[in-house]
Amino acid sequence: MTAILGLNLNHPDASAALILDGKVVAAVAEERFGQRIKHDPSFPQHAIRSVLSIGGISARELDFVAVARDASRNRAAKISYVLRHPFGGGKAALEHMHRANVDLGIGEQVALACGQSPDSIKAQLVNVEHHLSHIASSYYCSPFEGVTAGFSYDGSGDFTSAMAARCEGTRIEVLDRVHLPDSLGFFYTACCQFIGFDEYGEEYKVMGLAPYGNDSFAEVMRDLVETTSDNWFKLAKGYFGMHRGGESGKMDERNRVEMLRLYTDKWSAKLGSPRQRGQELTQRDKDIARSCQVRFEDVALHCFKRLHDLVPSERIVYAGGCALNGVMNARLLRDTPFKQAYLQPASSDDGLCIGAGLWTWHNVAGGRERFHMSHAYWGPSYSDDVTRRTAETAKMPMRELPHGMIPRAVASLLRAGLVTGWYQGRSEWGPRALGNRSILADPTRANMKELINEKIKRRESFRPFAPSIVREAVSTYFEQDVFSPFMMHVVKIRPEWRERLPSITHVDGTGRLQSIERDTNPLYYELIKCFGQLSGIPIVLNTSFNENEPIVDTPDQAMSCFLRTGLDALCLGRHLLVKPEHAALLDAACSDQAEPSAIAVDA
């Protein structure tokens, strides 16, 4: 057996994955454990212990430790940058050298995290370039074997912001790179910062805000990021912090990612004064968000069409933080020559650990067997005994049900208007709640979006909620029949259904859909089918099970969220609880049911 530990560490979204004989057996992000800080950039000690425990091996049995960073890459680009920016560029170079030195002690850190002596770890350390790890994370998890285009784009990693590749069989051939200071990801982040969304990882909020605006600043955005026929893209000099040299962010004393300002004072001459965090959003801010999103899509389409010129295939795999832009993902399938696309569920930096690990399997260990990731459930799970003990501590009205009765009982509560926490099986891999750590509700109720935003999630009112739908019904309700198991595509809801689905229809008539197959999550699939029988529409509102924190991972965390928020009900494994005022609804939901359906559930 070949055992590989893949790591993204000392970098935002620190994570770990365990790969045994070329197959992913576990993958988790550090933010779900320990301090539970979103985008936790610290050494992923808890994640390492978790994946090794799930895989049933010790650190001593590891053959390789694959790290998604290679500070030795792109030296010519770094030297050129230092020469143009002697002070700031020198600081950036020193930071990259420091990271290389940190990598020398990773084996010892893994040993300490697992409570073992440093000399007991015999694994070979393998460094894999950041964007190569991104592409590997999607290609080596995809079902594609023939010639496939590969792409990665984000803010930066190993002094690169984008990479193009040709993939075939077990080989990934890098064709081109975009080096700093040019970065489409930093362009988007700079726009986010300018309108007051200045914390790390808030780009998704601006994507949700954009449909409320008009493309009033199209000319400004074209000036900020340019494309030509003979290159990918370039940022306008003097308008971005990276052109001054140095890093784009740092870690504070509490292990939180602190972003440095990416826009310069020159923006104000074109856009006015920047919005401060907490100030009321104006129409100008919404228009900036809209123009930013439109320009991002235009530049991304330019890149994907150029990629197709380099790799004329109908298949594409891609990753990186920018790959979480669901509006762009749907456009790629509509407006480029690519007809088949694959993204794995953790397309941002948390997914780097899988890419580094699988690249090592194929290119260092010599593995030939490919792996296909068809579901996202790679985290920990907890036994019925654990969920029962947790449920009993609440002292709330509760029923313990066989698996076959759970879907209809929960569907009945949803149809009665109860907002329900749904906690089942192994936790999801990636930033999306995909049917195992979800908050569910009836999408046909007009007040549901406002209720959840105000009483449970306590977040901005403009942010949309996602629909989960059985795969075979997608074309009935959505204009684009896209298979989106990992909630990666924002598509138009058919006009005739928008008024009937008010809580999952965004202001522009779209929804970020998740299409569910019976084989990948039979319990969740059956729940949606049961809700469809009661409501006439096989769709549920799905949002992440959390309240301004990382998604819940343990039964205790799920119970805490249930008790302290406005959640009405909680399905914790086979244990269905409600707040006292809903006891009668619980009794009704659990009585007079038909024979339990046969559902194969991986406990």
Each model region followed by its residue ranges:
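Short beta-strand-loop/turn "lid" adjacent to the catalytic site in phosphate-handling enzymes
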Residues: S58-Q109, A136-S137
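Extreme N-terminal starter segment of soluble prokaryotic enzymes
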Residues: M1-L5
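Short HxH-centered metal-ligating active-site micro-motif
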Residues: F43-I54, V65-R69, L527, S535-I537
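Adenine-nucleotide phosphate-binding core of ATP-dependent small-molecule kinases
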Residues: R277-C303
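Flexible beta->alpha loop and helix N-cap segments adjacent to enzyme active/binding sites
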Residues: N8-A29, G34-K38, Y81, G88-A92, ...
